[in-house]
Amino acid sequence: MSTNCMFNLDNDYIYCKYWKPITYPKALVFISHGAGEHSGRYDELAENISSLGILVFSHDHIGHGRSNGEKMMIDDFGKYVRDVVQHVVTIKSTYPGVPVFLLGHSMGATISILAACDNPNLFTAMILMSPLVNADAVPRLNLLAAKLMGTITPNASVGKLCPESVSRDMDEVYKYQYDPLVNHEKIKAGFASQVLKATNKVRKIIPKINTPTLILQGTNNEISDVSGAYYFMQHANCNREIKIYEGAKHHLHKETDEVKKSVMKEIETWIFNRVK
């Protein structure tokens, strides 16, 4: 694994990570992490994918991890999407002709969907883990608060993520809870408002998506409700598959060993079915 940086169009410092295979890559996979976390939480998954001869890369979204920006605050969700596309285009230029896959978790899946819809010829396929596409699953009081306060008082708090919602593996819950690069503060209304706008946009554009998509989803997910995954499957017109994990929580790559192994196998199969 190696690290580097890039500067986005706003000249913000973006912390980047790369997991390179020994040989010339068979595919490129960009990992788009979720809200409040960072690319380092995908080290194990990225290393496993890289061992298959795939170049994996990622970055900390602005306002996350080691990247610049006010923590968990964004004035335009589209900046997340823009930065991902910038990073992918940069790496793809070094490996022309190598297929590119998006792997997005939660909010990172929302970013991935928007990136793929805006750039249909850039990506070969997507893998969405616990995709955040269903704002209806958010408690109604928090939903109204985010909408009303997002513009008027963007720094007001509207809720907080519960560490226990991450995984059934309590060791993983502990690691999440005490990770200094994870944002443990309450979610701000301005950030929540932008995320809600993005999820609403995603629901509208799902029928237009033509990028083949694999969805991995747990049934005991309090953050990205399983109904969002079913909504995508019902309304999308692209080649799509879904794998449901009974009882699994939000971070499938941090779940029980059985789930983690299955997730890795599903990702491997999905990618290599599309790599010549």
Curated annotation (Swiss-Prot):
Superkingdom of origin: Viruses
InterPro entries documented for this protein: AB_hydrolase_1 (IPR000073), AB_hydrolase_fold (IPR029058), Hydrolase_4 (IPR022742), MAG_DAG_Lipase (IPR051044)
Ranges that cross the membrane: none
Family from the record: Belongs to the orthopoxvirus OPG043 family.
PANTHER family the UniProt entry points to: PHOSPHOLIPASE-RELATED (PTHR11614)
Name of protein: Monoglyceride lipase homolog
Species this chain originates from: Monkeypox virus
